[in-house]
Amino acid sequence: MKKTADVIIIGGGINGCATAYYLAKRGIKDVLVLEADDSIGHGGSSRNGGGVRQSGRDVRELPYAMYAVNNMWPTLSEELGVDVEYYQRGNLRLGKTKAHLKKLETLASNARSVGLDMHVIDGKEVKEICPHLSDEVIGASWCPTDGHANPMKTTLAFYTRSLELGARYITGAKVKAIEKVKGKARKVILTTGEVFEGETIILAAGYESRFIARTVGIDVPMTKFFEECLVTEMQPHMFDIMLGTADADFYGHQSQHGSFVFGSDSGLEESIDKSFDDLRTTSITASAGCRAIMGYIPKLADAKIVRTWGGWCDLCFDGVPVIDRVDEVPGLILACGFTGHGFGTAPAVGLMLSQMVAGEDTIVDISSLSYDRFKSLK
């Protein structure tokens, strides 16, 4: 087995796979992806609700989120040769109170400041877009260019195409440390003792990135968060849009197969004591999510849940990721802390990381996502 590569990517989630694809596409084919699990995309990449959204994001994320929606997602299925089930039908973020609408107006105003078409509409307009919602909904933010896609199919499509273009993957390769050689990040050491060497190392391992980065003196202030989703039995067609709420207590959409896919939040996830290897869902989140869903979509009150799943997300302390070369450790690029909403931006992130490796300017300015922003915390 070859133990060297031009680029080593730690993490075989959607960001790692997308980066491998765009690197190989531009001719950098000596790319090695190390994935700790026995399967690709086993973490949050395949365990989210599939939102491809711009609305509700921090303004620091919007430029590349908008780039992905405008320039990448519409042709991604054709490019990767797989139907990733991308639908651009819009996103309603629902509100039931004046406080909700105030929060939504702030989000919409911030989004418009960087050019996103997002505005707040009243209850009548909401019902015109989605008549199946509760009469308690008095308004919503509306972003017509948001959508959704299939996370697993998208992740595996990037994986398959990158393989075809020459990238290599090793699963079951749990990274213990990065080691510097003459001041530069060069070696990746597995828990088995195996050592791989690369000219550039990209750290995209979700929450575990924090522990790996510490081995070269870098600390990204992240915590972990257990994300849970559920799927209902097939229902008559109701809508194609993406839904969320002002309080972010659930989000989801109806799939092309008729089932609904929802992610939900009990508000108590941080108090749930689970090991990182424990992916079992919790009754508290499922019940809280179902109550929220029924409160907004009464017609789903009798729908049966056929499947649930959970996965860990990496929550950065200020809510946006780190995508940056690290000055203190030449040769190391961080791509972590996506805070539960990295799926929709993955094509743009993969492209930008490939540009960083090639020494090019990125498609948009991401200086606000630099590692340097944490230095004031020390």
Where do the protein language model's features map onto the residues?
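Beta1/beta-strand and adjacent pyrophosphate-binding region of the FAD-binding site
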Residues: K2-N15, L32
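C-terminal catalytic lobe of FAD-dependent flavoproteins
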Residues: R291-K378
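Glycine-rich FAD pyrophosphate-binding loop
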Residues: A24-S45
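Dinucleotide-binding Rossmann-like beta1-alpha1 core, especially the glycine-rich loop
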Residues: G49-I129, D249-Y251, D277, I293
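Short beta-strand to alpha-helix junction loop
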Residues: Y64, R93-K103, W142-T160, D278-T285
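Helical element adjacent to the flavin cofactor pocket in flavoenzyme catalytic cores
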Residues: S141-T192, F196-E199
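Active-site lid/adjacent beta-loop-alpha segment flanking the redox-cofactor pocket in flavoenzymes
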Residues: M234-G331
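Central helical "cap/lid" subdomain
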Residues: E194-F239
